[in-house]
């Protein structure tokens, strides 16, 4: 039997976990007040906030902030802030702020099984075009870091619910590792240690999914660029071969997929659309054309363009 997903040695803070746990560093990038409130909540307590670099601060010179992060990591390791959960896989039960419950499994994947290249047939694949220019700054931030705080979610296509969901049937028999409220009205989360004998069952179920999905097992649902950076660090011999991730079923009822819109206010619709078409090289009707519907007031206008962007989302709503 192949092993696609493994237990890990996981560091768990022994402090107030509500103040320890913060949202992913790439969130609230246009709301510095959110991060200011987080700093106020954390105060002088040990916190993940002090060993990550929120992207809201990326515009300036961050060398001093990065040095401080590295010092904090060293201090936390030396001052017994963590306990080590050896050879552990965790069942996570997250209650979102809207009341929905999301189930996941935290464990290790092998970066040799992952590729962000377009057209890859790897076991683990990206779900959006990777902007390679985003990788070097992230590599620089991680260069001297002795701890990793990942926020990567891998999705499995498991309509029969054979991997994650069966674990919840026996959760009362599992050792509870944590149970706490997340700050800033973000819901709550519980974590349970998955028994060693159950890990083999998880991998057997994953092997079946792999065979049913033509070799594709995991799709990166969140953290595409984080995982790409981890792969780049590994390739450059400056990082681990393995990455800590959470595996979630794409059929989990808590997951809702919605389009991302860009809204422009205070502009003449046709003037803006004409400028957009011109910037994209004019109308294009080729087989690889992107079709856009621009909506404004009670009207709409359809345009067809040859996309220059490597991003998955490129919609304009007026």
Name what the model sees in each region:
Residues 224-276:
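Catalytic or ion-translocation cores adjacent to nucleophile or general acid/base/metal-coordination motifs
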Residues 61-64, 165-166, 255-260, 303-307:
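Short conserved micro-motifs at the rims of enzyme active sites and ligand-binding pockets
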Residues 155, 220-221, 246:
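Short beta-strand segments
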Residues 269-318:
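C-terminal catalytic or substrate-handling cores of phosphate/nucleotide-
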Residues 56-58, 159, 225, 234, ...:
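Short, glycine-/Ser/Thr-/acidic-enriched flexible segments
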Residues 199-241:
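Active-site beta-strand/loop microenvironment that shapes enzyme catalytic pockets
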Residues 168-194, 257-282:
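Compact, glycine/acidic-enriched structural inserts
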Residues 1-185, 193-195, 207-209, 215:
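N-terminal extension/subdomain marker
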């Amino acid at each position: 039997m192949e092993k696609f997903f493994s237990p890990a040695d996981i560091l768990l803070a022994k402090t107030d976990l509500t103040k320890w746990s913060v949202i992913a560093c790439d969130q609230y990038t246009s709301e510095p007040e959110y991060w200011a409130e987080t700093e106020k909540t954390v105060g002088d307590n040990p916190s993940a906030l002090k060993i990550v670099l929120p992207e809201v601060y990326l515009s300036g010179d961050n060398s001093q902030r990065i040095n401080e992060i590295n010092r904090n990591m060293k201090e936390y390791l030396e001052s017994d802030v963590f306990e080590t959960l050896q050879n552990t896989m965790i069942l996570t039960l997250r209650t979102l702020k809207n009341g929905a419950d999301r189930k996941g499994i935290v464990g290790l994947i092998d970066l040799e099984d992952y590729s962000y290249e377009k057209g890859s047939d790897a076991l683990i694949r990206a779900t959006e075009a990777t902007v390679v220019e985003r990788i070097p700054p992230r590599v620089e931030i991680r260069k001297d870091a002795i701890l990793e705080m990942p926020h990567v979610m891998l999705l499995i296509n498991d309509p029969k619910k054979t991997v994650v969901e069966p674990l919840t049937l026996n959760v009362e028999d599992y050792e509870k590792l944590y149970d706490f409220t997340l700050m800033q009205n973000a819901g709550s989360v519980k974590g349970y240690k998955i028994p060693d004998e159950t890990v083999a069952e998880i991998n057997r179920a994953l092997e079946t999914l792999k065979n049913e999905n033509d070799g594709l097992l995991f799709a990166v649902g969140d953290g595409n660029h984080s995982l790409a950076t981890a792969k780049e660090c590994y390739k450059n011999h400056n990082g681990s071969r393995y990455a800590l991730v959470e595996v979630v079923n794409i059929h989990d009822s808590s997951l809702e997929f919605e389009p991302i819109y860009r809204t422009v206010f205070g502009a003449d619709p046709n003037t803006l659309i004409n400028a957009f078409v011109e910037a994209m090289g004019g109308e294009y009707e080729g087989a690889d054309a992107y079709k856009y519907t621009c909506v404004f007031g009670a009207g709409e206008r359809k345009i067809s363009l040859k996309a220059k962007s490597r991003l998955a989302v490129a919609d304009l709503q007026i």
